[in-house]
Amino acid sequence: MAAKFLLTILVTFAAVASLGMADNVLLSGQTLHADHSLQAGAYTLTIQNKCNLVKYQNGRQIWASNTDRRGSGCRLTLLSDGNLVIYDHNNNDVWGSACWGDNGKYALVLQKDGRFVIYGPVLWSLGPNGCRRVNGGITVAKDSTEPQHEDIKMVINN
């Protein structure tokens, strides 16, 4: 199950990288400018000109960053460290996800279930010889009773 999920994410990244920005994806280094949106099914994520990031379901507001009127000409940018930041027209940060990691390739995905999630580099993976460090992560010992599967990988989003 986890392997299929990871494969789906990897295929999505590959498709988006080759085609440019999808309607529901913002890649690291990309910016969503004022009054533009990501769209997935019934959900829309919009960065408003006055700096409010708002999620709508079927046109009805269901979440907001509560940063309305903290600037103008605002934009939403996914940084190369995975931090999602709202900047005003003077490049002042108005709001941030306050979650970041090592520099890498990240993707903000507005999913069809309405969640918006930042995906990024694998922090660790379990190979046939146990777990090994990835990106300076924690070394985790493999339980001897656990089956060995090269295809098990875990991404931790804090």
From Swiss-Prot:
InterPro entries: Bulb-type_lectin_dom (IPR001480), Bulb-type_lectin_dom_sf (IPR036426). Transmembrane segments: none annotated. Residues 23-131 form the Bulb-type lectin domain. Keywords: Disulfide bond, Lectin, Signal, Taste-modifying protein. Residues 1-22 form the signal peptide. SMART domains: B_lectin. It comes from the Eukaryota. Residues 137-158 form a propeptide. One of its GO terms (biological process) is response to other organism. Homodimer and heterodimer with curculin-2; Disulfide-linked. Taste-modifying protein; sweet-tasting. After curculin, water elicits a sweet taste, and sour substances induce a stronger sense of sweetness. This is Curculin-1. Disulfide bonds join 51-74.
